[in-house]
Amino acid sequence: MKNFLVHDEKTKAEMLDYLNINSVEDLFKQIPDAVKTNSLNIENAVSEMETQKRIKSLAKKNKTEYISFLGGGVYNKFIPACIAQVAQRFEFLTAYTPYQPEISQGTLQVMYEFQSMICELTGMDISNATVYDAATASAEAVLMSVRITKKYKALVSNKINPQYKSVIKTYCWANSIEIEWFNDIPLNTSGYACVIIQNPDYYGEITDIKQVDTLLIAVVDISTLSVLKPPYEADIVAGDIQGLGIPMEYGGPHAGFIACREKYLRQIPGRLAGRTADADGNQAFCLTIQTREQHIKREKATSNICSNQALIGLCGTLYLSLLGKNGFYQAGYLSAKNAHELSKRLADKNIKTVNKNFFNEFTIEVKDADRFLANLKSKNVLGGIKIDDTHILVAATEMTTEDDINAYVENIPS
């Protein structure tokens, strides 16, 4: 992630071979040795993320911050500094919906690039240009499946985020859709509009996605797809992009997304940016398939969400562009590595991890969850989210340091 260069070792080797040189140093061999400085008394270069960590570690000597192992849909992720600078430009910082493409090409192109990136990550054909968050994306996906199948029953996993479940319940109640909850997918699903699962689920468990006899909706945290394979088996993918350079900020704002197969294009909610040509034949961008939307269809629109969180989508687009494929993978790898290291250290303290397979979030079993978390909090460690009296959801990210893990393990109550 250093300097946001996306070149890996293979790419560097190909460039050196093309230039017919052996190393980067060969580019400077024309400079006389007499004028070169052999060594400088400075450390090797580090990435922006590592620099921020080092500066924050010095600032933390005042002990004013908590170490966070909270997750459950909101994560302490690394945010490149330039994201805020670009997002605050007046050209982007607007509530205006780009209905007039002739004056909105920048915003429309960002929306188009966002959709393209989501499609690449999820393996779907089409993505919208954001909705509010993963909760509304999940609920809107259920309504979308009902419009497609004309069936008013939905199978919803008990293991999805409780906040998502709450919003799904509200949407389904208002639209007379019956919900059946499950722990394991039933063998016969043909009588339902959809089966909706979360992977990894709320408790952090990674599960194999099975084929079903109806529409399959997969709810994902997009940052997990830096390492995990895309949910190709799904018909609709819903999720959140908070992990793509969006601060936690008291729980919002977030941005959700819905991606799907091309054949469901006219049922997807939210705005769609398309690429076209202007009167002179030049590439241009515009909102497309607008007959689905409320400014045309009114109460018959596929969705009545008025804001599309485009500014948050811009932040996610910038994040992916800055890190590149390799940087995005590295962030995911570090998150998983830190989580598994913490789980191992907890096991050494006889704290059991319930999960068989997990990414960066897992559930632990303790004797008294309230006492366990209170003791950690008194030591400036937010140890996780209480699930019940004996279980806690714990998350780690690329921002989790070895000192953070030590602070957690060393302050476990006896």
Regions found by a protein language model. Name each.
Residues 116, 136-144, 314-318:
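Contiguous, well-ordered alpha-helical segments that form the cores/surfaces of helical PPI scaffolds
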Residues 326-408:
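Conserved C-terminal alpha-helix-loop-beta "cap" of PLP-dependent enzymes
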Residues 127, 178-182, 354:
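General small-molecule cofactor/ligand-binding pocket signal
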Residues 99-103, 119-139:
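Short loop-beta-helix segment that forms the pyridoxal 5′-phosphate
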Residues 15, 136-282, 346-349, 363-366, ...:
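Conserved PLP-enzyme active-site core in the AAT-like
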Residues 1-39:
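Compact, charge-rich alpha-helical regulatory domains located at protein termini
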Residues 33, 37-112, 296:
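N-terminal entrance/gating region of PLP-dependent enzymes' catalytic architecture
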Residues 244-349, 354-356:
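Active-site C-terminal subdomain of aminotransferase-like
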